[in-house]
Amino acid sequence: MSILEGISSYIKDGESASHNLGLEIEHFVVDENGTQIGFGEISALIDSVGKELNAEIHYMDGYPVGYHTKGYTVSLEPACQFEISIDPYSDLKNIRTVYKEFRNTWDPVFEREGYHFETKGNLPNVELGLLSPGDIPLSPKKRYQFMNSYFNASGKYGKYMMRASASAQISVDYASEEDMVRKLRVLQKISQLLM
């Protein structure tokens, strides 16, 4: 199979009769000085809140690092960026409702601990030059240690991606290659407005 045939097959395999959108948002959790929450603290909060919600708690290497509950999944990224992955919905109202419920759950928890969400693409203290990405500790997930070793040997921007970036990502169902191309063209045009 050629590369072109492989790509074509991959696109064909992704076709769906549904018309859903998925949304993932990574957040920085910082104190008033812009310092990120530590792994031990956020892991304990995930365990506590997950149990209060009767959620299915996810563990990695023995640590609570996320949970799944009705409508969404929470997980930790390499430097404790806090991600919500909202289940796919066909209605933006449902996505908004789930995100509000997530924020209504977590905003008071973090506020009580002296933290708040920052929803920016770059960690503000790094962007301001107050902190170097190399100074930000990684969570103890083994895979992040492997990624870190690779990025340290392969260039200078991997540590920024792992430690000092957060993103929002959407997934869009498509019915055919033509439908996918049409939706990608629209998304490319509006992406500049969303940044």
Model-derived regions, located:
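Internal, well-ordered domain-core segments that constitute the primary functional module
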Residues: 142-195
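Terminal catalytic/cofactor-binding subdomain
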Residues: 1-156, 164
